[in-house]
Amino acid sequence: MQQSDLQEQQLYRSLFLLKTPLIDLRAPVEFAQGAFPESCNLPLMTDNEREQVGTCYKKEGQAAAITLGHQLVASDIQNRIRKWAQFKEENPTAWLYCFRGGLRSRLSAQFLKDHGVDINIVPGGYKALRRYLINVIDQASEKKLMIVGGNTGCGKTLLIQALDNGLDIEGRANHRGSSFGKQVTEQPRQISYENQLAVDILHISQHASSLVIEDESKAVGALYVPERLFAGMTRAPMVVVNDPLEIRLQRLCYEYCTLMTEKFNLALGAEQGWQAYEKYLQNGLYGIRKRLGTEKFKVMNTVLEAALKQQKNTGSVEGHLNWIASILRDYYDPMYQYQLEKKADRVQFRGTFQEVKEWLTVNTK
């Protein structure tokens, strides 16, 4: 690696580790496809302006496209400069970038300079930062990885979150990974998800040489664990949490029912929140109907509806324990035990939540 490349790599690492505020000059349509943590979309051009300039570039070349770009943004450029300057004033350490760190970045920085505001340009722009974070994830797949397994409700995600070297792939995906994994808010875009995981890995690497990750399928809701990282996970040693059924039931009842009721009510208000919560549980159960079989699904659905009615009338979530116990017994536990048997040679330790946490604290650094 050349000295200049190494310096840029160190710069990118520093920008992310210091949580440097970033002005993303790309058009909104570009930003929506994926962005970085700490970035704010303050575009030089609107989507329509960008499209016109792109068409002009293809037909008439760069010079004509630049001229058209100046003409298109002229009427609103003072407003855009004001927004950039305000962001820089509120975030003195801010940098800016466009897609490649080229013309859009230089023009915007010059506009700011003409108004007495200096700002640094990220060399290589979004494309270089994105490539850097992809490399971070790829390199992480070669690190020492430890996978945390266990039946549904064992608190694997809670365990990951409690560890200094835990990489929370479900939390960053905003999905718990199961049929009941959907959250109140939407999942991020795949690119944004990968970017955030990479930044998390950078932070962990400051104090640890290993990563502890939850045993997960490749898909987490509508998102996917990055390919190289997932490949590393399938080879890594494991620990397995074996919490008693009663503890698991109470934990799942809290997560599926108590917590989700609160989240939906907070986001949507009491009436709409309740309707969304009902739909969340109904859709979750419907999502595993084929695995349960028609008859079991009908029985469990009846139990679920009774539990919802009881909760609405009394506020008690106790009735939900019945159908949750059934899906553990008839679906989740048999499925996970089957999967775990195929990974038995990778298991290094088994124990309760607390025992596994203590083992990981001592044996993974």
UniProtKB/Swiss-Prot annotation:
Gene3D superfamilies for the chain: Rhodanese-like domain
GO terms of molecular function: transferase activity, transferring alkyl or aryl (other than methyl) groups; tRNA 2-selenouridine synthase activity
Signal peptide coordinates: none
Keyword Transferase: yes
InterPro entries xref list: Rhodanese-like_dom (IPR001763), Rhodanese-like_dom_sf (IPR036873), SelU (IPR017582)
Domain annotation Rhodanese: ranges: 16-138
Keyword Iron: no
Broad class of enzyme this protein falls into: transferase
Reactions mediated catalytically: 5-methylaminomethyl-2-thiouridine(34) in tRNA + selenophosphate + (2E)-geranyl diphosphate + H2O + H(+) = 5-methylaminomethyl-2-selenouridine(34) in tRNA + (2E)-thiogeraniol + phosphate + diphosphate; 5-methylaminomethyl-2-thiouridine(34) in tRNA + (2E)-geranyl diphosphate = 5-methylaminomethyl-S-(2E)-geranyl-thiouridine(34) in tRNA + diphosphate; 5-methylaminomethyl-S-(2E)-geranyl-thiouridine(34) in tRNA + selenophosphate + H(+) = 5-methylaminomethyl-2-(Se-phospho)selenouridine(34) in tRNA + (2E)-thiogeraniol; 5-methylaminomethyl-2-(Se-phospho)selenouridine(34) in tRNA + H2O = 5-methylaminomethyl-2-selenouridine(34) in tRNA + phosphate
Keywords assigned by UniProt, alphabetized: Selenium, Transferase
Enzyme Commission number, as recorded: 2.9.1.3
Protein's GO biological process: tRNA wobble uridine modification
Active site per the UniProt annotation: C98
SMART domains: RHOD
Family: Belongs to the SelU family.
Purpose: Involved in the post-transcriptional modification of the uridine at the wobble position (U34) of tRNA(Lys), tRNA(Glu) and tRNA(Gln). Catalyzes the conversion of 2-thiouridine (S2U-RNA) to 2-selenouridine (Se2U-RNA). Acts in a two-step process involving geranylation of 2-thiouridine (S2U) to S-geranyl-2-thiouridine (geS2U) and subsequent selenation of the latter derivative to 2-selenouridine (Se2U) in the tRNA chain.
Alphabetized NCBIfam families for the sequence: PRK11784.1-2, PRK11784.1-3, tRNA_sel_U_synt
Quaternary structure and interacting proteins, as annotated: Monomer.
The protein, known as: tRNA 2-selenouridine synthase
Taxonomic source organism: Psychromonas ingrahamii (strain DSM 17664 / CCUG 51855 / 37)
Gene transcribed to yield this protein: selU
